[in-house]
UniProtKB/Swiss-Prot annotation:
Protein function: GTP hydrolase that promotes the GTP-dependent binding of aminoacyl-tRNA to the A-site of ribosomes during protein biosynthesis.
Region (G2): 66-70
InterPro entries membership: EF-Tu_GTPase (IPR050055), EFTu-like_2 (IPR004161), EFTU_2 (IPR033720), P-loop_NTPase (IPR027417), Small_GTP-bd (IPR005225), T_Tr_GTP-bd_dom (IPR000795), Transl_B-barrel_sf (IPR009000), Transl_elong_EF1A/Init_IF2_C (IPR009001)
Binding site for GTP: 19-26, 87-91, 142-145
Assembly and interaction partners: Monomer.
Matches recorded under CDD domains: EFTU_II, EFTU_III
Reaction equation(s) it catalyzes: GTP + H2O = GDP + phosphate + H(+)
The protein's enzyme class: hydrolase
Record-given protein name: Elongation factor Tu
PANTHER family given in the database record: ELONGATION FACTOR TU, MITOCHONDRIAL, ELONGATION FACTOR TU-RELATED
Native species: Gemmatimonas aurantiaca (strain DSM 14586 / JCM 11422 / NBRC 100505 / T-27)
Upper classification of the organism: Bacteria, Pseudomonadati, Gemmatimonadota, Gemmatimonadia, Gemmatimonadales
Amino acid sequence: MGKAKFERNKPHVNVGTIGHVDHGKTTTTAALTKISADKGYGTKYIAYDEVAKASESQGRRDSTKILTIATSHVEYETENRHYAHVDCPGHADYVKNMITGAAQMDGAILVVSAVDGPMPQTREHILLARQVNVPSVVVFLNKCDLVEDEELLDLVELEVRELLSKYNYPGDDAPVIRGSAINAINGDPKWVAEFMKLYEALDSYIPEPVREVDKPFLLPVEDVFSITGRGTVATGRIERGIVKVGEEVQLVGYNAEKKTIVTGVEMFRKLLDEGQAGDNVGLLLRGVDKKDIERGMVLAKPNSIKPHTKFHSEVYVLTKEEGGRHTPFFKGYRPQFYFRTTDVTGTIELPEGMEMVMPGDNVQMTIELIIPIAMEEQLRFAIREGGRTVGAGVVTKILA
């Protein structure tokens, strides 16, 4: 048989397994690669031991370069899509991964043992998925071969659906597949058939993500300089969207509201007609003084993003071993919050009844910055003091 050709024409979707410890996330991940490989979709089977070997050495640095998170990355194909799949070895790795967005998820596969039903981490992972806005959750009830009573399975399924609804996922509509990952890996046709249903659920239920280039233009300003006789240039990496010569853009953040026209796009000292997501560019701006623009502002499609100062967030506080604080902090703590390219001072409010936050905790807190920053929900940030990173967070709700 010839080598299966890798087709790049299938849509690419990022997913991950979530759920309680020992409910079978890693075995499910291995099974997803095995059955896809057996079907001849050009996937490589990654056995349990390989998936479980996920270590910090192959872990992802998150985008804010705060933490190395132990994650295992595998890929597999279905008839319609190519999936990149992340599996984390430990609960703490999940918390860090989801808060920092190190491995983005367009959808999650919630693995629940049919023997135990939902457990504390099942809840916590659903809550985290909701907080960081994972758009959809597909449920895989694992170890169904160990439950003889069909009614017990119905009960577990009902419990999981209610839990999803509690955290504002459509619990009644979510696909729930009843399977056995280990038996599917061993080739038992009954359980392989259930994995075919799981692929189908992933393909039909998880919406195809909007590509970064199709989103409204945004560039965080890293540096600014003047070119005599030509004007002011702002440099940075385009976070999303496309910018073309002659288009209007808006400065946002630091109380700037100015709109301007892009008169030139430069990359590697060459002039381009346009720059797109991922490009490091210099944008020549009409009628803008060097003093009007500074690092920390963003250039964006007009009216696509607003400046804000106050928001709810989900935060992970680094442990001492991760280079974080050695001691707890209390309400009224005033660190710097690093957004995109700059530090801004702010104060924190802790949830009612919470006196202090210990290193290693993840906590919901309200933050108020001293100057407005271009912000939207799901924006990631770092918490720093004296140039040292002590926490990682995500904006969950904008207040002001």
